[in-house]
Regions:
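Active-site-adjacent beta-strand/loop module that shapes the phosphate/pyrophosphate-binding cleft
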Residues: 4, 13, 63-66, 72-96, ...
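Generic C-terminal helix-cap and adjacent flexible tail
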Residues: 130-136
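Conserved Nudix-box catalytic region and its N-terminal flanking loop in Nudix hydrolases
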Residues: 17-58
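Conserved N-terminal beta-strand and adjoining loop/helix that marks the start
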Residues: 1-19, 41
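NUDIX/MutT-family hydrolases
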Residues: 87-89, 98-129
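Short histidine/acidic/glycine/proline-rich micro-motifs that form metal-
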Residues: 42-43, 76, 112-114
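Short secondary-structure boundary/capping segments
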Residues: 1, 10, 26-28, 75, ...
Length: 136
């Protein structure tokens, strides 16, 4: 079984809302047009933080953010591969970005996150936010 290691940015703006991005059409129906936190694969010889900066620059043209802390690592078994995802809480006061790889986005409060149709691997991150970050 193929194993993939990725990073995800749980990006919070100055209003305390989180950036949720929607994947485009995909041949893998279980991630087709699902919502996720932006991020992507860690390249060889790249740290998790370096991967996060590179991926947000590639996917969103976003460079103005700070990595605050690591939130959670999720291991999820999809039908075709095993995904290990390292999620980091990131902040940006005035995040300006462009959707280069996604088809839609929302800024949502923690309690609104469950309204979206999330990729299965992102659900534990959403639950973690609801259980921990909403108290801060």
């Amino acid at each position: 079984m193929k194993k993939v290691e990725v990073v995800a940015a749980v990006l919070r703006n100055k209003e305390g809302k989180f950036l949720c991005v929607q994947r485009g059409p995909n041949k893998l129906k279980y991630i087709h047009e699902k919502f996720e936190f932006p991020g992507g694969k860690i390249e060889l010889h790249e740290s998790q933080q370096e991967a996060l900066h590179r991926e947000l620059a590639e996917e969103l043209n976003l460079r103005d953010f700070v990595i605050s802390k690591k939130l959670i690592t999720v291991v999820h078994q999809y039908p075709d591969f095993e995904l290990t995802m390292h999620a980091f809480l990131c902040t940006s006061d005035y995040p300006k970005f462009t959707l280069n790889e996604h088809i839609n986005y929302f800024w949502l409060k923690g309690e609104e996150l469950l309204q979206l149709d999330w990729a299965a691997a992102d659900v534990p991150i959403v639950k973690h936010l609801l259980n921990h970050e909403s108290r801060n």
